[in-house]
Structure formats: structure tokens, C-alpha cells
């Protein structure tokens, strides 16, 4: 049962998204001179960084319910978009009093965009599976 789940490329995409979402929690996403914006610096960022890996990891196990899996992935993409917007907006708001050259964005800011692309690829793979199952049902 689980062997067929792991062989699906969209399951691998979703697993990579889960891993990336968890790893960005351990690194600061911006430097503001003497302080850094991190995972625990805001309850909104904390909440999004907790919900996204849980939703994407849960979506892996709904491989038999492809429509629900696509909905979970779409919901996850929306959350990732909010996370990326929040990270960038909080940096620009917090960096207003920062001196030139002392404020920097780090690599974790790019991760939500990578996650969105991988999740979109997973949705496409799930849709292909659903189309293949429906075509097989028509032949029966």
C-alpha cells in the first residue's frame, strides 16, 4: 500500500516541501543590524511555519483521495504565499530605522517560493493521476 505512495513523484515533491518548511524554522530570515528576524519573532510567522509542514505532510497520506489531496496542496500554496508576503513585509517594516547596508534578507526568504513551485508540480502530478483513474473507469 505505502510502496505505491512513495513511488509517486508528487509524494516526493510534498516530502521535500515538508523538509524545507521545517528547516526554515531553524534559520533567521533577515538581519536588522544587531538583531535577526526568526521563527519565534512573530506569532503569525510561527503559526504559518507550523501549519505548512503539517498540511503538506498530511497531504502525502491522502494519496487515495486525490481531490482532497489537491485541495490540501492548494491550501498549502495559499499559506506559503502568505508566509512569503509576511516575511518580506515584516523585513521592510522593521528595516525602516536600519542604517544603509546593515539590513539583509537571508536564504530562507526564497524557500516559500521554491515550496510553492514544488507544491504546484505535485498538484499537476495528482491531477494527472486523477485523469488516468477516470479514463480507466470509463473503459470498465
Regions found by a protein language model. Name each.
Residues 7-10, 101-121:
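Individual transmembrane alpha-helices with interfacial aromatic-anchor signatures
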Residues 7-15, 69-76, 112:
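Interfacial segments of alpha-helical transmembrane regions
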Residues 91-94, 116-128:
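Extended, acidic-biased charged interface segments
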Residues 32-92:
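The feature represents the first ordered module of a protein
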Residues 122-140:
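Cytosolic juxtamembrane helix at the C-terminal end of the final transmembrane segment
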